[in-house]
Regions:
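P-loop NTP-binding module
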Residues: 1-226
């Protein structure tokens, strides 16, 4: 996206960015969890592109790889992964593990070494300290988390943040998996900001890869194309 800002994909993320700004105009969303019902649905790519899009509006953005089982962000941004979120969680919540990237205003905190107890670390009081610390440093923090059908990590973090953005992929995510993920978020009292449908218009032959819609807890859906 950063290398082709005029592409349909870039435009889709700009629309997603705008939609998120209108989710709660009186109380701006400052911490977002991205997840998906299952693996292979593109949640890490969506997290990275959304972070880039937000940074392009002169916001200070931190992208955190909170997938402590199968980390991806260090690969997407070609960064070392010797230290990262796990370093904050097991050592010092205030140490500097942010890495600058080519996008002005955006920094990335990679996962760091994969720990034996990811869920316990993410559910700890130290994670709350890390969240508060990062919130003071950035206008918005995006947390890339594991798929919801695999482990509970996304649910744990979703209940601690301002909202969750769920990513599904057309032709991959089953209706049952999507409903199950939504129920998990509802049970944990996580706020659902919306759903990004990956590959939607691309498969329909229109050249854009993403479609965004928001639904409320009342089950009423208001669709807006990106």
């Amino acid at each position: 996206m950063y290398h082709d800002p005029r592409s349909p994909v870039s435009e889709a993320f700009r629309t997603l960015r705008t939609n998120l700004e209108f989710v709660s105009p009186g109380a701006p969303v400052k911490s977002i969890v991205t997840s998906s019902p299952g693996p292979g649905e593109g949640k890490s790519t969506v997290a990275a592109n959304l972070a880039i899009s937000l940074a392009q509006t002169n916001k200070r953005v931190i992208l955190v790889d909170a997938d402590l089982r199968k980390s991806t962000q260090h690969k997407l941004f070609s960064l070392p992964n010797r230290v990262g979120l796990t370093s904050l969680l097991v050592k010092d919540a205030n140490q500097d593990v942010e890495q600058e990237v080519a996008v002005p205003g955006l920094s990335v905190i990679t996962s760091g070494p994969i720990p034996p107890n990811p869920s316990e670390l993410l559910a700890s009081d130290v994670m709350d300290t890390v969240r508060d610390y990062l919130a003071q440093k950035a206008d918005i923090v995006i947390y890339d988390t594991p798929p919801m059908a695999v482990v509970t990590d996304a649910i744990i973090l979703g209940s601690r943040m301002d909202g969750t953005l769920m990513v599904v992929r057309l032709g991959v995510t089953s209706k049952e998996a999507g409903k199950r993920a939504k129920e998990l978020l509802k049970t944990s009292r996580s706020r659902v900001l919306g759903v990004v449908v990956n590959d939607a218009t691309h498969r329909a032959g229109y050249g854009s890869y993403y479609y965004y819609y928001y639904y409320s807890d009342s089950e009423n859906e208001n669709d807006s194309a990106s």
